[in-house]
């Protein structure tokens, strides 16, 4: 018999024993009570009493009620040391026969298993090894776990199981719990920042008749009552700008977007973004906002502006570098033979891109080719926080053209560690120019570009009523969480990432 077969037999055998224990509990009455009320978390008790010596603790005689999942147990005759885990951390229990009502230890405590959830009332004391411990006077089994924990000693190591059964990952891995606490702090910190700046939080449609606001392939669904196809939104941008037209001069939305595209360590089809718009501001103001926000998040979450990530350390305390797309291509592409003239002529740009092994789409103009060259030769070099600016108008259909060079836009992308974290620009508020750019996107879509934008006539109508000078930005929450949690994959910071169906 193989080791795997032995393991499966042990697993099913243990489950059978646990089911028998649950049946015995049911026979006694309520097997899943909901009357226990705890008054302390493990971490709070450690913070309050870890530095208190045993004699002082004995004098104070603090009474506590704690609850959590049994993670370890060590029986010693008529007493058992148990470690329970709650949302804040772990604490040790001392459960002894002599401290409990007659029969409770033998009949109840001895039947407890790893993974069970228990409630304990007792007195805090220090063991001989100076470990803070709860001496139990009252005990109650709150939930009988029928399935054993996956690995009693090494945690949950299988990556796919961690993603599919995140609850087991959170039980077993302290680092995973820390990651999602950091994610929560990122979201809370962003919300606090924008509300403090006078922005109002809004919600815009997830189901849209016309998906807009980004170049991406949407998910399609059908609304039965209206009998129309609809799309999960790829971005909230066009709705948020309608609100600025309506007089909400500072708005933000923190919510989900959906893009029917590939899955990678950086991409999940369902992801979270903060998108905000500020009237009477330009893209320079938003770059300043972004620096200030990320500096604040680093200090609040990590206590420093130095952010470690893999082999790198990012310094959020210094001003972020700002470089145009053309300058970045020339700076990092020179060793591959890229010269200035290649960036201003379509045929030369195509020839340079082809030498780099870039597959050129028929619908691409000069701007798209230059952008592809940038992605090939320069993007991965933008390690320290860097704002890439002056994107071609062709690839920025919603951004305002630059006053001095209308071939490029007043746009920026924030790169950290060679990855795009955010995208923002001074908004295009010329309704006629916007209509023309939508038409160009329609032509690109007709030519085979699946990610080209749809035309939104209602949005053009809104612009015709007058959009004040405005700038807007979107920041990827998942990628920020990766950054602050030092997580290598986007799946590590999404509680339930998209996975193939398991047969």
From Swiss-Prot:
Cofactors demanded by this protein: Mg(2+)
InterPro entries in the cross-refs: Aa-tRNA-synt_II (IPR004364), aa-tRNA-synth_II (IPR006195), aa-tRNA-synth_II/BPL/LPL (IPR045864), Lys-tRNA-ligase_II (IPR002313), Lys-tRNA-ligase_II_bac/euk (IPR034762), Lys-tRNA-ligase_II_N (IPR044136), Lys-tRNA-synth_II_C (IPR018149), NA-bd_OB-fold (IPR012340)
Enzyme class, first EC level, given as a word: ligase
Pfam family, one: tRNA_anti-codon
Gene Ontology cellular-component terms listed: cytosol
Keyword Metal-binding found: yes
Family per record: Belongs to the class-II aminoacyl-tRNA synthetase family.
Listed name of the protein: Lysine--tRNA ligase
Native source species: Actinobacillus succinogenes (strain ATCC 55618 / DSM 22257 / CCUG 43843 / 130Z)
